[in-house]
């Protein structure tokens, strides 16, 4: 067939680690922001050992960036760099991420708290606990802003991931916080830290909430903590199938790690089949 009159279709651009590293270290703030995201998501797929080290080093440096600031004083590049470092799994980033917990930008603190939970380094426990000082009375909305004074939801979840049993007394009062999402985070973490089913059942009851967003949040928390008694309720919950799949995958992964009896894992596989 002749090519006359047809529009040429260009080949998709194949981005590379060296290109993205150069972009991250450039001067265009929007390109740097994108590069941080890209390196966190795709950077390790093709990177050499030397490139992996360069990625981590460049992202750690980006945590101290001063060039990319919003009108309200936020640091978008720092946020993306923290998120990327959490995904990359290199504990070299822990000291710099701990320092980010002191950043004036709420969303940098939140991203750093999540990343520290993902990295699983116990050095983060005490600094994370410090953000809960003042308890529920401190955890109030900032006037005129859509967030609390501190990212307590992210902090509590990360303390659960880190197995920080020393934080149980700090976390327990947040079960009575005015925001359901914070209550859910506390229940999830306390289940992870104690194994007490009362916390899992609290989230299970939230699947009956009239608010679909709260149902989604509770469902994902149940999946993340691997709460097997919730499997059937998750299948019946009034949320989209995509959320149910994520939650059941989480429970299945936890059961496989614990070498659960075959009949339990089989029922989870059957539940997943129903959703596919």
Curated annotation (Swiss-Prot):
PANTHER family: DEOXYHYPUSINE HYDROXYLASE, PBS LYASE HEAT-LIKE PROTEIN. The keyword Lyase applies. Its EC number is 4.-.-.-. CpcE and CpcF associate to form a lyase. InterPro entries: ARM-like, ARM-type_fold, PBS_lyase_HEAT. Gene3D superfamilies: Leucine-rich Repeat Variant (1.25.10.10). Belongs to the CpcE/RpcE/PecE family. SUPFAM superfamilies: ARM repeat. Keywords: Antenna complex, Lyase, Phycobilisome. The keyword Lyase applies. It holds the Pfam family HEAT_PBS. It comes from Thermosynechococcus vestitus (strain NIES-2133 / IAM M-273 / BP-1). GO terms for cellular component: phycobilisome. Required for the chromophorylation of the CpcA gene product. It comes from the Bacteria. This is Phycocyanobilin lyase subunit alpha. One of its GO terms (molecular function) is lyase activity. It is an enzyme of class 4 (lyase).
């Amino acid at each position: 067939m002749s090519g006359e009159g047809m529009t040429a279709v260009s080949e998709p651009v194949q981005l590379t680690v060296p290109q993205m590293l150069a972009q991250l270290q450039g001067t265009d703030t929007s390109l740097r922001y994108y590069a941080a995201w890209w390196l966190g998501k795709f950077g390790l797929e093709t990177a050499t050992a030397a490139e992996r080290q360069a990625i981590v080093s460049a992202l750690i440096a980006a945590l101290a960036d001063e060039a990319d600031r919003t009108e309200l004083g936020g640091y978008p590049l720092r946020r993306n760099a923290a998120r990327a470092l959490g995904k990359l799994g290199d504990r070299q980033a822990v000291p710099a991420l701990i320092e980010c917990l002191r950043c004036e930008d709420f969303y940098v603190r939140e991203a750093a708290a999540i990343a520290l939970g993902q990295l699983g380094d116990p050095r983060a426990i005490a600094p994370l606990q410090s953000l809960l000082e003042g308890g529920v009375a401190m955890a109030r909305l900032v006037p005129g802003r859509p967030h609390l004074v501190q990212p307590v939801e992210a902090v509590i979840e990360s303390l659960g991931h880190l197995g920080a049993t020393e934080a149980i007394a700090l976390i327990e009062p947040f079960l009575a916080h005015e925001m359901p999402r914070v209550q859910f985070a506390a229940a999830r973490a306390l289940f992870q830290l104690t194994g007490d089913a009362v916390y899992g059942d609290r989230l299970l009851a939230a699947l009956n909430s009239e608010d679909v967003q709260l149902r989604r949040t509770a469902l994902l928390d149940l999946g993340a903590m691997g709460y097997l008694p919730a499997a059937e309720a998750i299948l019946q919950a009034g949320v989209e199938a995509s959320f149910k799949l994520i939650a059941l995958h989480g429970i299945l992964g936890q059961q496989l790690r614990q070498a659960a009896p075959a009949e339990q894992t089989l029922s989870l596989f059957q539940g997943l089949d129903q959703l596919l």
